[in-house]
Amino acid sequence: SVVEKIRALGGEWAALDDAIQARGFLDLVSRITGIPDLLYDPWYFGGGTHENREGQDLDPHVDFNRHPVERWHRRLNLIVYLNPEWQDAWGGSLQLHSDPRAPDDRVSLVTPLYNRCVIFETTETSWHGFSRIALPPERRDLSRRSVALYFYTRERPAEELADTHSTIYVNRPLPGHLQAGHVLTDADVAQLHIAVARRDQHNERLYKDLSRLNAQLEQATAALHAGRLGRLRYFARRVLARFQGSFMIGPG
């Protein structure tokens, strides 16, 4: 679950919201990262409090690269973990990938322990995610909790520029033991069902994105036709039709 409007939670959350938008804090993060003129996101798009439970995971991905409203460049992820107790063996540890599409993908793990802060740049290669949470039966009351803060700039270096995009996911590969001749176990079948369902979810998300873009294109086209240029095109088509009609041969 996600709560983007953390200020509405009151108390310490409101104090956190005050702290991260203060110029002193933004300048400190700029000094640490070398990225000047950082901007706080008052909308917390995609950020805020995050909580994940047993069986959940997050496929490797790079984040959306422009602010949906301000069109700022997204530059930094800052994640603070809120878990007094966690082990890598339970899954859910942050995975930083070199390239999840590559056979030799290198993965670094960060255990999501309480008060641990991770800062990394948001680029076209900042692949990250976390593996499926599989808690021991006696610890199923636990959840993976964090607060995610994203920071922006009005400009970014030319060599880092890319077309505007939403979050880009890469589906996890099938387990290495699933080879020809292997007899599927119940666990294997369950894992295959999960993999297929995940791909279906990504396809559905892409179809929705395409439908939304098509609707926006249709609205823009309608607005253009309704304007002066649209009226000129309409009259031009009428004149052309009459001109062509004058040379048509009538029925015999």
List each language-model region with its residue ranges:
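Non-heme Fe(II)/2-oxoglutarate
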Residues: 1-32
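Short acidic (Asp/Glu) patches
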Residues: 11, 32-33, 59-66
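A short coil-to-beta-strand element that immediately follows conserved catalytic motifs
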Residues: 36-46, 90
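Beta-rich nucleic-acid/ligand-interaction surfaces
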Residues: 45-58
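Amphipathic alpha-helical recognition patches that constitute DNA-binding helices
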Residues: 48, 77, 146
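Catalytic core of Fe(II)/2-oxoglutarate
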Residues: 55-56, 63-74, 83-224
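Helical coiled-coil/dimerization "stalks"
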Residues: 211-252
